[in-house]
Structure formats: structure tokens, C-alpha cells
């Protein structure tokens, strides 16, 4: 590990470790900067931008610095600065406890384990790699199978590939309701080894294979409701598996940018990033719980998320913070959509093996992942029928 770190840091030092901060106006006056210098425009906080090389992006992540890569979205002329979030009133209490409890009983740890074993068998799911494309193709087939077996496709449900220029595509499963008001549940499908992304293995069991199979199982459970599968819910529900989160939320930005342009009415977005590791909390003497982000999120939706945990999960929740741009909910927020995020524990007790060859299934708890699946299903069902 130390040798790999030295190699990575030497490469970073050679290219220059620090890039200059650049204003939005400077970019607009110099549209060729990115192409001439092969650098990327990242945002480390709202409106705080910097040009970096790809190696410098990975160095920042190794140092625990979050960012969102806004280069491609900026080049389209639709600069993704923060939009004001639309106000949405969420249900003050659960309305469908009986229905959700019955559906939650059918969620399967065995399904999640089998899916995660296959998903982590790809050498890496790095978004620029061929195996990243193959893993996305495998996942697409699983999502399509779940939708097909439920019968929902006969009532208009679809599964589509959202293409990106880097190769690995994002996946969108859409379960139409009686209106186009939409509830989104997301996870990112890509993985990365920060030392040598194009070469070294990145099983990504927890980050974010766990979230990927969690919402896949929640989708399967949700579609066992005839009302949902037959399109009788008030609202449309979408499940997203984003490409290139590790590169700076690239896939989710492309999707929510598209939604903003097309005036899509997104009423809620929940991101599940890392749902399987509990040993860190237990070692710290902290109770097993779901971590609920309380920074850079919609406060009303976050309160609703807490209420869902209390109503439908066997564990409680703990508030935590991850800073700006820690996962794909950032993209939804940037385009004015209410967003929330759940993770496996308080941030200080989350998995420290991520982004390495050792992010493996053996460290994960499928019992805990089941709680996140219950959370996802309850969130989706309650909001599918919410009177927005």
C-alpha cells in the first residue's frame, strides 16, 4: 500500500499538485482552456472552482476532499450553479404502514448477496474501463429482469441506458404513475482504486456496490405492489444507477441537467451511498444506525427520511455530515431538486477500505443493508402516493 501511495503521489507531484482557482468569468472568456491544458473544472464548494488534472482529482480524493466536476456541463453552456430548491410539502406521518410492512417482509438478503457477489467480480467498475461498461451491462440486465418479471412493463414501466461520452452508461428505471411528478432513488454503480484507477482492482463492495444492490432489491420489493406496478400511484417513481460518481458526479449531473432543461418535476431524490459497513460504529461503541446527512440537503425531505426510518426500520438513525459534493444528491440539489442522503453510519465510522482492492463483501453486513432496503421501499411507496 505504501509503495502504491508513493507511486501515485510521485505522479501527482510530476504534473503539479496544486491548480489555480479560476472564476466563472475567466472560463467564459477562455473556452479552450480545458482542451489545451487537459484540465478539468471542479467545484469544491458553491461557486468555488479550480482547474485540475485528472491525477490531481485523485490526489484530492485521497486527501478526503470532495468535489463535483462541472467541466462537461459547463461546456454545454448550461452552467450548473446552485438553483433555488422548490418548496415541497412532505407527509407529516406515514400513510401506508400496512402496505409497506407487507412489502418489506418480502425483501431478501440472499438476493442482495448474490447480486453483490457478481457485481464485485468485475476487476473494476471504473467509468472509463471496459469492465466498467460490462458491469453496467450486467446491472442493466438485472434491472430489466426485475421490471419484466413484475409485469410492470405491460403498464408502461421502462429501463433505459443514459449514455455518456466516457463509455459507462447510467441506468434509469421508470415506473409511471398517474402524473409526471417524480420521486427518484439513486446509487452510483462505478468503483475506483485511487492509486491506479485504470490498472488496479476496485471491487467496490461497499462503495457503492452496497447501495446499488440495496435499491435494486427495493425496486423488486416495490413492484410487488399491484398499485405501483400497474401505474395507479399518484406519482412516477424512478430508480437511478449513476455512472462516474467517483469522477465528480458526472453521470448524475448529466441526468439532472437534462431533467432541468426538460422541465421535469422532481419532487424528491434520495441517494444511498455505502449501506453495508457497521463494524466501525460497533468498534467505536456506537449503536448500529442509519446515517442521515444533514448538510447540503433539503431539510424538509431529510425530516421525512428520518420519519421513514423510525416507522419502517429495526434500527434508528444518527445525524451526520459529509460536506459539499460527497455523493450524487449534490447534482439534484444543484438543479433545484429537493435531495437527501442516507449512509451506513456516522461519517467518522464509515468504511475506510473504500477506493482500494480491499473494499470487499466480507466486511459488510447484509442485515444492515436490509434496513436500507426497507428505508428505500418505504420512502418510495409513501411518496409515490403523496399529494404533491
From Swiss-Prot:
One of its GO terms (molecular function) is aminopeptidase activity. Its EC number is 3.4.11.-. It is found in: Secreted. Zn(2+) 2 binds at residues 207, 246, 355. It holds the Pfam family Peptidase_M28. GO terms for biological process: proteolysis. Its cofactor is Zn(2+). CDD domains: M28_AAP. Glycans are attached at residues 106, 180, 232. GO terms for cellular component: extracellular region. Disulfide bonds join 322-326. Residues 20-88 form a propeptide. InterPro entries: M28_fam (IPR045175), Peptidase_M28 (IPR007484). Residues 1-19 form the signal peptide. Monomer. Extracellular aminopeptidase that allows assimilation of proteinaceous substrates and which contributes to pathogenicity. This is Leucine aminopeptidase 1.
